[in-house]
Design a protein with these regions (language model features):
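STAS-typified acidic loop motif
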Residues: 2-34
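Amphipathic alpha-helical interaction surfaces in cytosolic regulatory modules
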Residues: 23-95
Length: 95
């Protein structure tokens, strides 16, 4: 059974955090991309984070969309931090 992707935005002090939960794969990448684009654009020039601790699956298309968001944030004058506690997932990002 395919798990949907969900998101919420929380404030952690001065930082806004986009919390992603579920699977980021070929089926959910368009939705994930839209979420990330809106989040980055809405917080341009700020320190922001994407919390991926509740992400249960991540394929290559998902890695690509996350890296695209990091680049978009940098272009917008933001610093985007990834919050990942799964070692395998951290390795996929070279962390």
């Amino acid at each position: 059974m395919h798990m949907q992707l969900s998101s919420s935005i929380i404030r952690d002090g001065p930082q806004s955090v986009l919390v992603l939960a579920g699977e980021i794969d070929l089926a959910t990448v368009p939705e994930c991309s839209d979420m990330l684009t809106k989040f980055v654009d809405d917080h341009a020039g700020s320190d922001i984070a994407v919390d991926m601790r509740q992400v249960t699956a991540l394929d290559d298309t998902g890695v690509g969309v996350i890296l695209g968001a990091v680049s978009r944030a940098r272009t917008a004058g933001s610093h985007l931090a990834l919050v990942i506690d799964d070692q395998h997932m951290r390795q996929r990002f070279g962390l």
